[in-house]
């Protein structure tokens, strides 16, 4: 879990995940949406996300297309919901005192 959190801790990678959440995009489209980031940096972030299993990639000609692998984020979601639920339970207990 900690390695997954390390991967998504980078703001640029979170932005890339947001961009590929609902539709497939090629690396060039992702770079166009983030003009302040070099194409090389976008490629490196995509490689990290892909290695972590957070994005799927497919090649079509000379282009690579990326899409978020939402099903692989399930364990992270469950962990965050548990943490959030525990925090809310503690807050409720304190409020009732």
Give names to the regions the model predicted.
Residues 2-38, 63-74:
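N-terminal helix-turn-helix DNA-binding core of bacterial DNA-binding proteins
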Residues 18-22, 73-97:
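Amphipathic alpha-helical dimerization/coiled-coil segments
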Residues 41:
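Residues in the helix-turn-helix
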Residues 46-47:
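Short, hydrophobic-biased segments on the C-terminal half of alpha helices
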Residues 50-61, 67:
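Beta-hairpin "wing" of winged helix-turn-helix
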């Amino acid at each position: 879990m900690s390695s997954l959190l390390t991967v998504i801790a980078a703001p640029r990678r979170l932005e890339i995940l947001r961009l590929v959440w609902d539709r497939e995009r090629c690396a060039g489209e992702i770079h166009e949406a983030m003009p302040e980031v070099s194409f090389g940096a976008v490629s490196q972030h995509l490689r990290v996300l892909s290695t972590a299993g957070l994005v799927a990639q497919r090649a079509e000609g000379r282009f690579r297309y990326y899409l978020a692998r939402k099903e692989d984020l399930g364990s992270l979601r469950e962990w965050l919901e548990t943490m959030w639920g525990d925090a809310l339970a503690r807050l409720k207990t304190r409020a009732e005192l």
